[in-house]
């Protein structure tokens, strides 16, 4: 089971009851944060989620509404007693931005490992439980979408283990992926494991125009979290001008990508009641929700 939470659903500037953009994934006690707008810490505090075990921070791009909460978050993590390194991934400019934070936080008890993304190529990073796929998207400055895959272990096959005459004392280690050599015999995980099982896929895209590449990138996601800067179809010209999306465009991506759920987020501060426009998305992709700050859902593995 994996927990997904929208910490903030606002774009451009915060308004009452709507923090700026941030999303967090929690799995097996470890956390991955995407974007860190103003109010990120407030939402985490209200939820009671521990900050200390945030291992990875991903940035889509470096507009202030996506990054302004970072200095305070790093200092709070420092005060939590964390000593393990934190990995931060983001577009070109990441190194300068984080180095600039040294003015505010000159000494941290943990190291920061920086991964700076250049150009428009696709990237992949594996950090702990999280397999992170990265796609360059269409915004006014370098911007990236992220897809987080959590793999599921293959199922133990008792009949297969017995058929292969694997000693009982080796079953546990083989199930964990270890190989064991005894005398001239090599025992491998394949001798006790059955078929592969589908994991979970959470995809996240804000500040982008639609594209065919994005559809393929988020294909078959269990949850697709996508910006819906404007709800009204009549504001499409504005979305095109500022390189954002309207609700119906996000819904088309969700439908074509055959995702399980679409969560809309990153609303314009002028969009006070996004729920009023939900039918613009639902008419295209039924399983759509309007994101709210601190909306949490547990996503279960399917057999």
Swiss-Prot record:
Enzyme class label: hydrolase
List of residues binding Zn(2+) 1: 61, 63, 139, 207
SUPFAM superfamilies documented for this protein: Metallo-hydrolase/oxidoreductase
UniProt-listed Pfam families: Lactamase_B (PF00753)
Cofactor note: Binds 2 Zn(2+) ions.
Keyword field: Endonuclease, Hydrolase, Metal-binding, Nuclease, tRNA processing, Zinc
Keyword Hydrolase: yes
Role according to the record: Zinc phosphodiesterase, which displays some tRNA 3'-processing endonuclease activity. Probably involved in tRNA maturation, by removing a 3'-trailer from precursor tRNA.
Oligomeric form and interacting partners: Homodimer.
Name of this chain's protein: Ribonuclease Z
Source organism: Clostridium kluyveri (strain ATCC 8527 / DSM 555 / NBRC 12016 / NCIMB 10680 / K1)
Organism lineage: Bacteria, Bacillati, Bacillota, Clostridia, Eubacteriales
